[in-house]
């Protein structure tokens, strides 16, 4: 049996979060004590961002098409109330993020020539650009990273191929798995990429950039906490007409904590299943709704996409009217539903939202790089919100239909 090199064994046995933290610390130290070397280390960051730029368009195209093709027709799940809660929660999260971005605008350190950027004139121009992006050539859309066109073609082909042979569907599914594997390999390089990004950024712009990221992180986490402790309880109260906090806190404690550390909604599905069983929810419902929630219930992703996109807009000095902000919330909601099952999925969909404002893919990918720098906390908090909300909304919808579950569930209610 071949023995692994000790360094390889150490890397494989250490979590990606820990590796990113090490890369972050080394990047800061390099910028502080060896600024010239830090600027050279920027090559690692450039390679990492370049790899992301290369794989992101294909990733969106294949995953969306595979998801639509794989949908089972005629499957009776009684999922309408839960689906409504999923979409409502995701949209409200995006809307809260828009408001927070206006109240607490964040600026990023981006390398951009403002003369090359033409901001849209308003909602009419944005919609016109959207329409023309939809009808673009699919190959050109992939080459130009036109995510609106990519989404349109992926959805269209997915619907058209839903009646294809099982062999064809299997090929598309295998292709999506292959692309996801490549993405995971790129993400494994995140510690080195972040080391280079942090080192070169701090060496060139000083430590003000780090404080700028701190403010951005506060806005992101603040929005997620507001959704978890204010908006979600209001939605649950609307459904069950009782004090929502016992149920909310139970879901956060038993689902959110584990999701925070695993940073994977898919990995947290067994935890949510066990909690749903503990809450005595109907198995026919939660067996479908929880895996589905891990795919489309993405409040945290909607917040990430919106806040980082708005930060790019503020940095570039663009003005955003109310109608465009609402459209951004809708686009972020739809985009977030495609962010599941992919490491860094929400970050890779930021260019789609940025395209609404005429921001080039090069600049948008710099924003994605910023997201990876703060991703140690951002991704963990995002996953905790996403995954705990899956079981929360499933429980709320079931309890609204069957009031006996309110008394049977092992959480205190307000009437006790």
From Swiss-Prot:
Keywords: Amino-acid transport, Cell inner membrane, Cell membrane, Membrane, Symport, Transmembrane, Transmembrane helix, Transport. The chain crosses the membrane at residues 15-35, 49-69, 82-102, 141-161, 192-212, 217-237, 288-308, 316-336, 363-383. The keyword Transport applies. It is a multi-pass membrane protein. The keyword Transmembrane helix applies. It is found in: Cell inner membrane. One of its GO terms (biological process) is threonine transport. Coiled coil: none annotated. One of its GO terms (cellular component) is plasma membrane. Its main location: membrane. Gene3D superfamilies: Sodium:dicarboxylate symporter. GO terms for molecular function: neutral L-amino acid:sodium symporter activity. It catalyses: L-serine(in) + Na(+)(in) = L-serine(out) + Na(+)(out); L-threonine(in) + Na(+)(in) = L-threonine(out) + Na(+)(out). PANTHER family: PROTON/GLUTAMATE-ASPARTATE SYMPORTER (PTHR42865), SERINE_THREONINE TRANSPORTER SSTT (PTHR42865:SF8). Belongs to the dicarboxylate/amino acid:cation symporter (DAACS) (TC 2.A.23) family. Involved in the import of serine and threonine into the cell, with the concomitant import of sodium (symport system). This is Serine/threonine transporter SstT. It comes from Aeromonas hydrophila subsp. hydrophila (strain ATCC 7966 / DSM 30187 / BCRC 13018 / CCUG 14551 / JCM 1027 / KCTC 2358 / NCIMB 9240 / NCTC 8049).
């Amino acid at each position: 049996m071949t023995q692994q090199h000790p360094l390889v064994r150490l890397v494989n046995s250490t979590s990606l979060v820990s590796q990113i933290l090490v890369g972050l610390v080394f990047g800061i130290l390099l910028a502080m004590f060896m600024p010239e070397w830090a600027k050279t280390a920027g090559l690692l960051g450039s390679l990492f961002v370049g790899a992301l730029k290369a794989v992101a368009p294909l990733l969106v195209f294949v995953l969306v098409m595979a998801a639509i093709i794989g949908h089972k027709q005629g499957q009776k799940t009684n999922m309408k109330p839960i689906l409504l809660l999923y979409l409502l929660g995701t949209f409200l999260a995006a809307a809260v993020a828009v408001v927070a971005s206006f109240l607490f605008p964040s600026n990023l350190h981006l390398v951009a020539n403002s003369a090359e950027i033409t901001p849209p004139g308003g909602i009419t121009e944005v919609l016109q650009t959207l329409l023309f992006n939809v009808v673009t050539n699919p190959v050109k859309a992939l080459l130009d990273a036109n995510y609106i066109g990519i989404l349109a073609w992926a959805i269209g082909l997915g619907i058209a191929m839903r009646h294809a042979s099982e062999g064809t569907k299997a090929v598309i599914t295998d292709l999506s798995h292959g692309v996801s594997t490549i993405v995971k390999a790129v993400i494994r390089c995140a510690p080195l990429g972040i080391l280079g990004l942090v080192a070169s950024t701090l060496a060139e712009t000083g430590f003000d950039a780090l404080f700028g990221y701190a403010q951005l992180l506060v806005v992101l986490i603040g929005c997620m906490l507001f959704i978890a402790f204010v908006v979600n309880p209001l939605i649950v109260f609307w459904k069950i007409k009782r004090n929502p906090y016992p149920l909310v806190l139970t879901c956060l404690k038993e689902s959110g904590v584990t999701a925070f550390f695993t940073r994977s909604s898919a990995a947290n599905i067994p935890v949510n299943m066990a909690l749903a069983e503990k809450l005595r929810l109907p198995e026919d419902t939660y067996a479908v709704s929880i895996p589905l929630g891990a795919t489309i219930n993405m409040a945290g992703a909607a917040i990430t996409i919106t806040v980082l996109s708005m930060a790019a807009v503020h940095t570039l000095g663009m003005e955003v009217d109310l109608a465009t902000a609402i459209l951004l919330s809708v686009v972020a909601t739809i985009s977030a539903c495609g962010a599941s099952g992919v490491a860094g999925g929400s970050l890779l969909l930021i260019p789609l939202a940025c395209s609404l404002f005429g921001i080039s893919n090069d600049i948008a990918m710099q924003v994605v790089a910023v997201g990876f720098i703060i991703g140690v906390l951002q991704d963990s908090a995002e996953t905790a919100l996403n995954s705990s909300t899956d079981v929360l909304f499933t429980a709320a919808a079931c309890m609204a239909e069957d009031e006996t579950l309110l008394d049977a569930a092992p959480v205190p209610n307000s009437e006790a």
